[in-house]
Amino acid sequence: DSDCKDKLPACGEYRGSFCKLEKVKSNCEKTCGVKC
């Protein structure tokens, strides 16, 4: 969890069009297991 937050501080809080950016989406899902 802490490692995840270090890499993606906003992980789990992505919303709207920002979440649709493929790199952000895939990084969030791969690193944190969070679905955008």
UniProtKB/Swiss-Prot annotation:
GO biological process: killing of cells of another organism
Protein name, entry field: U-metritoxin-Msn1a
A GO cellular component annotation in the UniProt record: extracellular region
Cell compartments where the protein resides: Secreted; Nematocyst
Record-level Gene Ontology MF annotations: potassium channel regulator activity; toxin activity
Listed InterPro entries: ShKT_dom
Family indicated by similarity: Belongs to the sea anemone type 1 potassium channel toxin family. Type 1b subfamily.
Cysteine pairs bridged by disulfides in the record: C4-C36, C11-C28, C19-C32
Keywords: Cytolysis, Disulfide bond, Hemolysis, Ion channel impairing toxin, Nematocyst, Neurotoxin, Potassium channel impairing toxin, Secreted, Toxin, Voltage-gated potassium channel impairing toxin
